[in-house]
Amino acid sequence: MNACHFSGWIPFAPETRYTPSGRKIICFAARVCDERGAESILRFQMDGDPVAPLPPELAPGRAVEIEAAATTQAVHRPDGRTVSRLVFHVTRLAASGRRQRRPGDSPLQLALF
């Protein structure tokens, strides 16, 4: 695993999934910016307490600092091809205030996990 650090903001609400064994997985996205100023949306996963509410740091519009471990995962497609996907597992999540909306930003964004 490779350790990564990201600064960004949460563009839309997270999604909660449960494994067959009952483990809670929180899937969320963050819009991050690289050193050249280019923005990307990255998807993250983190373990959650099965009975606890979602962390307030994951509220849409919240600025966050994320430390994650990156792993490569094989994905088998319906057409028979196997491709690799980079998966980020969160090791630390910290809020850093609210993001200031820029002119031209859409107030609604859709997440597909």
Task: Give residue ranges: language-model regions.
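Single-stranded nucleic acid-binding surfaces, predominantly the OB-fold ssDNA-binding core
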Residues: M1-F113
